[in-house]
């Protein structure tokens, strides 16, 4: 009786295991939030965050940086020609409306009513549509905001904790421009370029300036100037942009600066460095956990040119917000004085 030979099983070559894509994830972001949290550092009732680093003595010293009396405006005009395009949160550019005009006056309409001739107007705008400060109520991590306050304390009436009004007499001190674009020998950094802590340190070294506790650090990427030169904002409002890498959060925490500002829409690099779709991860750490205020959409052209000319990259900065009760941000016109 013939014995049938057992068929040999064909060797099946296993496909190599797929490697998980490496990169920044929400889990990494939340871990960094916990690691760099300043909650409770200035007491359980604090609503100022790292603005607490600025002392009265610091302000006096900063005032001594005024040598020439030269003032640089760092705010954009509030008008219909701003950078908003509705891509993020439906923000629009300022709308200016007249309530009383010279046309009314010369037609004799006003005097019978109020006994004088005059003009009056109002503006309709999102608080963060142009050059602005973010309040510490602007960004949440989970269900909490700065210092552990519940996010639900920001309701239809505004921010009952961490509102912008708490900054009313705080936004003055030493300003430092870090012209990263110039350090990289570029008029404008490319969209998607992630500025590293090494870039920041080397820019400061090139400029001969030291970053100190309580400083307001202003980053120039050249993006805004490029848009203004072209007469086209393009995707500036929420699109791709050069900006700070997520990993600069450690630099910000360790330097103990009090404000971080930029000529871009959102300071951090876009597209973001996360691989799982976590949006604006740098914001998650900096505002609600470290407690640092953001100055966004700052106009830097003349200041950048002057600093390059005289080699002085430090100045007195005065940038108070509008005292908007329970506001989550405020339009501003910062002043750098040298």
Show which residues each predicted segment covers.
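Active-/binding-site microenvironments in catalytic and ligand-binding cores
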Residues: 2-338
């Amino acid at each position: 009786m013939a014995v049938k030979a057992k068929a040999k099983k064909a060797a099946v070559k296993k496909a190599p295991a797929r490697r998980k894509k490496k990169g920044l994830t929400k889990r990494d972001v939340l871990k960094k939030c916990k690691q760099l949290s300043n909650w409770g550092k200035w007491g359980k009732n604090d609503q100022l965050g790292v603005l607490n680093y600025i002392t009265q003595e610091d302000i006096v010293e900063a005032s001594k940086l005024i040598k020439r009396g030269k003032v640089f405006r760092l705010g954009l005009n509030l008008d219909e020609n701003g950078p908003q395009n509705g891509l993020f949160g439906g923000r629009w550019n300022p709308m200016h409306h007249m309530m009383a005009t010279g046309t009314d006056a010369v037609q004799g309409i006003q005097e019978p009513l109020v006994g004088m001739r005059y003009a009056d107007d109002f503006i309709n705008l999102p608080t963060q549509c142009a050059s602005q400060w973010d309040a510490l109520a602007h960004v949440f991590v989970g269900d909490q905001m700065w210092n552990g306050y519940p996010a639900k304390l920001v309701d239809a009436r505004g921010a009952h904790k961490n509102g912008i009004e708490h900054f009313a007499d705080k936004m003055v001190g030493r300003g430092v421009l870090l012209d990263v674009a110039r350090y990289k020998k570029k008029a404008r950094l490319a969209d998607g370029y992630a500025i590293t802590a090494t870039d920041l340190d080397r820019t400061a070294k090139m400029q001969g300036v030291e970053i100190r506790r309580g400083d307001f650090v202003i980053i120039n990427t050249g993006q805004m100037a490029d848009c203004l030169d072209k007469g086209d904002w393009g995707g500036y409002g929420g699109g791709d942009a050069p900006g700070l890498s997520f990993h600069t959060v450690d630099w910000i925490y360790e330097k103990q600066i009090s404000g971080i500002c930029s000529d871009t829409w959102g300071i951090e690099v876009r597209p973001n460095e996360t691989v799982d779709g976590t949006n604006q991860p740098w914001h998650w750490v900096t505002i609600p956990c470290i407690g640092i205020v953001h100055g966004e959409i700052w106009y830097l052209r003349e200041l950048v040119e002057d600093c390059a000319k005289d080699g002085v990259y430090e100045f007195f900065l005065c940038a108070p917000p509008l005292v908007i009760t329970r506001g989550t941000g405020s339009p501003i016109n910062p002043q750098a004085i040298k």
